Structure formats: structure tokens, C-alpha cells
Amino acid sequence: MSTIKSVFAREILDSRGNPTVEVDLTTEKGLFRSAVPSGASTGIYEACELRDGDKSRYLGKGVLKAVENVNKILAPKLIGLDVTKQGEIDRLMLQIDGTENKTHLGANAILGCSMSVCRAAAAFRGLPLYRYIAELSGNKSPMLPLPCFNVINGGEHAGNKLAMQEFMICPTGATSFHEALRMAAETYHNLKLVIKKRYGMDATNVGDEGGFAPNIQANHEGLELIVEAIKQAGYTGKIEIGMDVAASSFWDAKESKYDLGFKVPADKKTPDMLVSGEGLIKLYEEWTSKYPIWSIEDPFDQDDWATYTRFTELIRNRIQIVGDDLLVTNPKRIVEARNKKACNALLLKLNQIGSVSEAVEACRLAREVNWGVMVSHRSGETEDAFIADLVVGLGCGQIKTGAPCRSERLAKYNQLLRIEEELGANAHYAAKTLSGVGH
């Protein structure tokens, strides 16, 4: 039988020590457990992550309300349903919530159930999770993704003065996933040596996602450090750079400009730290000419559509422009961005939209117009490796899930190694074949 026998949620802690939701679902096949991630820099259009707001517990970040919503509202409705009806179950949960942004039940409550349903259905069908997701999404070619490793952390993810949030290494010259992982790990260790030599041992402390957080202020310094590490590791021309600028986090609405010094003390700020959208475009053009950058995520504020469209028109044939805060994995925002030609790739985050079915639909909409799709973790992660199976099953060809450091990040990379091993001669590695460049 593929019917749900029980559903139970609990409050656990994520990799930042903040509470999150974990859901256990049982069928005759056994117990299926899923844990929900959480972001630090979040887009204003994301689905609602329900927090308790009780300052006496976890500084207001508790999730007992979301847990209660699973145990008292969703569980009674889900028991007895067929786990192989993913779309119907997800739609039912959205119906019960009844809000545009999942503010009633919380996306963290709905997603935990949705992921566990997916796992249970895969077990019922006797399929690995990635195979079942491929079937669910209509994808006939599971594919190992190009991994993008966040090796220097700034922005909301680190206590340094870097405005831009992530500087990533992307092994575009690898021929397999295991080779890509080795290349990245070797470059990561070389980067540690470069940073240690230049800034001292304490500069090699790591941020939320396992990347280094040296106390540098100029964003181009981060790029130069990575270029040096790639060279030292012997991978010049085989590893390129990706960036997550997370520009919404330093958009100054009052000045209608971008504040590159938003983490710098007021008395140390200089006028040139405030730049216009046009100024940022010039900066990115300069960097993409000078450094081996192939992907830039969230280069502008989530509502700065005009600048996105202008930038994409200028540079889409050279690099991938990824929408994260711009799109929030939301089909409506994706359609709007498609119409405005505002970017050429989607960052797909399960908890931004809040259910497996909606994430599958978001991927479909992006691939329909040949956009790249990069599946992503969040800065607050758990040992749950669902997204590793998701990216292979969807066959979208790109993943970012932190540095090759910290167990909650390696849980995903190691699962991808296992999947590659299981596929054997049928394992296909995406490299850059599914990027949004040129679209």
C-alpha cells in the first residue's frame, strides 16, 4: 500500500543553531524524514517561513507554530492519502493554507511534508529518489550537475566588510562530477594557503557556507584571491568563477543607489561606495573582461527590472545572469522575467516556493526558454541531501551547496558522488552544457 499512515513534525536545529522543521512520514514501506533549510539573505517575495516570534525562545526564531500546523492541521488531512499523488497532495496543502505566500501554515510546514511524500513515493515505486523525481518531472535524462562552490563569503553570510555575498569556483573543465569535486577541493585548500600567507591564520575562519571570510573590503580582492588559488592548484582555464552579488541586501532605497560600503562604519565610508545601477553594470563589464567569470547571481535589487533587462541585453551572450531574489523560484515571477528578458537563469530553492510540485513547475518554465537552472541550498542547512537527488532528477545541470567544507554541505556533494557511482557508464556530467549563456 502507498497510503500515508502517520505524519509527525518536530523542531530541530539547522547549521547556524537556529530552529527548523523536520517531518517524519510513515507508510507500510517505512519512515521517511525530511528537514527544511532556511536562508539568511531572503528575497521579499519568498514564501513565508513561519517563526514563532517569542523572544524568550531562540531569540524569537522558534518554529513551534509551524510544527503544530503539521501535527494538528496537515497530518489529519494527509493520513490515508496515496503518496504517489505528489501534485494532488501539494495542491491540497496549498488549498488548506489558502494564502498567496503560505503565511497561514508556513512554507516550512508544507515543504517538510512535501519532501517526505516524495521520498515515500520513491520507496513505494522501488526507485532511487532521483529516478522518481525524473519521472515526476518528465525528464528522461538524469544528469550530474556542474557544482559551484562558495569559497569566499561576504554580504549577509560573513562578518567581514565585503558587500558581495558569494565568490564561487566552478569546475567547468571537469569531465565528471568526481573530478569536479576533486578540482574544487584542491583549489579550496590552495585558497586557504593564499589567504593565510597574505592576511594571516585568523583570515581562514569560515562563514556559514564553509567559505573563507577574510577581512577584506574590496570585492575585486576576492576575485584576485580566487584567480591566484586556481593558478596554484594548476586549473587555470578549467575552473571559472561564479558570483552571488545579493545586491538587494545593499540597495539603498532612500538614495536609489547601491551601497557597496553597507558594512563599513559610517565614519569610514566614501562617496564612491554609493553607485547607480549603471555604475554596477560598468563594474561587472570590467570584471567579466578581466576575470574568468561565467555566472553572476542577483546583480541588482529584486525590483530593479529595468537595470536587469539592460544588463542581460548587453552581456547574455558572455555570461549567465541568475535570478534568485528576483525570481524566488516563483512561477509568476519567472513568467514576468521571461517577458521582460530580465535574466537567463533561475536559482531554484525549494523553501522559497514551498513544495516539490511548484519547484518542478518553476524548473519547467525556465527550461522552456532555454534558461540555465541552478539548484541551491540555503545558508542555514541540515544533513538532509534531498537537493542532490533533485538536481539529478530534474537534469538541470547546476548546483550550489557551499564550499567543500562543513558536513551539512558535504552531505549533498557526497550524495552526488554516490549517484554518479550508481549510474556508472550512464552517468552524464553537465559541465556548462545547460547554462543560460546566449539565451
Swiss-Prot record:
GO biological process terms on file: glycolytic process
UniProt cofactor note: Mg(2+) is required for catalysis and for stabilizing the dimer.
Cofactor requirement: Mg(2+)
Compartments reported by the entry: Cytoplasm
Chief site of localization: cytoplasm
Source lineage: Eukaryota, Amoebozoa, Evosea, Archamoebae, Mastigamoebida
HAMAP family in the cross-refs: Enolase (MF_00318)
Catalytic activity reported: (2R)-2-phosphoglycerate = phosphoenolpyruvate + H2O
Molecular function in Gene Ontology: magnesium ion binding; phosphopyruvate hydratase activity
GO (cellular component) term, any one: phosphopyruvate hydratase complex
Domain of life: Eukaryota
Residue spans crossing the bilayer: none
Record note on quaternary structure: Homodimer.
Keywords, ordered alphabetically: Cytoplasm, Glycolysis, Lyase, Magnesium, Metal-binding
Binding site for Mg(2+): 244, 297, 324
InterPro entries xref list: Enolase, Enolase-like_C_sf, Enolase-like_N, Enolase_C, Enolase_CS, Enolase_N
Catalytic residue positions: 209 (proton donor), 349 (proton acceptor)
EC identifiers of the protein: 4.2.1.11
Pfam families in UniProt: Enolase_C, Enolase_N
Positions of substrate binding: 157, 166, 297, 324, 376-379, 400
Pathway entry: Carbohydrate degradation; glycolysis; pyruvate from D-glyceraldehyde 3-phosphate: step 4/5
Protein name: Enolase
Family (UniProt): Belongs to the enolase family.
